[in-house]
C-alpha cells in the first residue's frame, strides 16, 4: 500500500550544531500543531540534539505514536555520482573529507531502501521523519528521478514540511515541498543567507 512520508527539517539551532534555539523551539511547536490532523503511524528522527529535540516537541502532540531514532535520518553527505556535480558546488563539497563522503553515500543509499518505498503493511502508513536538509534534498531529488548530485541546492526551511507518497503501482509522488504555511515570515529561512532566499516569503 502507500507510504506517505512526511519530512520535517529540524528547527533553528544555536550554535548551528547545538541544541534548538528559542526560535527553533517555536518552529517545532508550530510544526507539531500543523501535523495534528495527520494520522501518523510512526515518528523517526536522527541522533543529533537539534533533531531529537524537534521530534520530541512534535511527538508531544502524538502520545500514542511510537518514536524511534535512526542514523539513516542523520546528517550526512549524499552521493553526487561518478561525473560529479556542476562546478559551482565543487568547492562546497571540498569541506567534507573523502571518508565522510563515502560514509554519507552509503547511508543515503540505505535511506532510500528504508524510507523511499511502498509500505509493506496491508494498509497505508503515515510516517514522519525529522531530519536534515541534505537528506530531504536527496529524497526529493531521487523521487523526481534527478541526477545523484541534484540534492545540492534543494533547500528546506527549518521546520518546513515536505510530503512524498510511495506506492507499488506509481512512481514516487511529491505532494508538497518546503511547505511553511504554519510559520510566520519571521520564522522562515532562518540560518540561510539572503543571497539564496526569496524576499518576504
Which residues does each predicted region cover?
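Acidic, low-complexity terminal tails and accessory targeting/binding regions
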Residues: 2, 64, 75-87, 123-125, ...
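Active-site-proximal alpha-helix that buttresses catalytic centers in soluble enzyme cores
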Residues: 2-70, 99-104
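Generic beta-sheet signal
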Residues: 5, 123-134
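Active-site metal-binding loops of divalent metal-dependent hydrolases
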Residues: 11, 133, 180
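Short, active-site-adjacent cap segments at secondary-structure transitions
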Residues: 14, 50-52, 76-77, 135-137
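Phosphate-handling substructures
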Residues: 15-16, 59-117, 201
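Glycine-rich phosphate-binding loop signature in dinucleotide/nucleotide-binding domains
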Residues: 37-39, 118-125
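Active-site signature of alpha/beta-hydrolase-fold catalytic machinery across serine-
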Residues: 57, 138, 142
Amino acid at each position: 500500500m502507500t507510504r506517505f512520508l512526511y519530512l520535517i527539517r529540524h528547527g533553528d539551532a544555536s550554535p548551528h550544531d547545538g541544541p534548538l534555539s528559542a526560535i527553533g523551539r517555536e518552529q517545532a511547536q508550530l510544526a507539531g500543531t500543523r501535523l495534528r490532523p495527520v494520522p501518523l503511524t510512526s515518528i523517526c528522527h536522527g541522533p543529533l540534539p537539534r533533531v531529537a529535540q524537534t521530534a520530541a516537541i512534535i511527538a508531544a502532540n502524538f502520545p500514542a505514536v511510537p518514536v524511534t531514532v535512526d542514523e539513516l535520518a542523520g546528517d550526512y553527505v549524499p552521493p553526487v555520482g561518478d561525473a560529479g556535480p556542476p562546478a559551482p558546488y565543487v568547492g562546497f563539497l571540498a569541506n567534507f573529507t573523502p571518508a565522510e563522503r563515502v560514509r554519507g553515500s552509503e547511508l543515503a543509499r540505505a535511506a532510500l531502501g528504508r524510507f523511499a518505498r511502498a509500505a509493506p503493511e496491508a494498509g497505508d502508513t503515515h510516517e514522519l521523519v525529522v531530519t536534515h536538509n541534505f537528506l530531504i534534498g536527496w529524497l526529493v531529488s531521487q523521487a523526481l528521478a534527478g541526477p545523484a548530485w541534484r540534492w545540492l541546492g534543494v533547500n528546506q526551511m527549518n521546520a518546513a514540511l515536505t510530503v512524498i507518497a510511495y506506492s507499488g503501482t506509481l512512481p514516487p509522488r511529491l505532494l508538497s515541498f518546503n511547505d511553511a504555511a504554519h510559520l510566520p515570515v519571521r520564522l522562515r529561512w532562518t540560518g540561510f543567507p539572503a543571497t539564496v532566499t526569496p524576499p518576504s516569503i
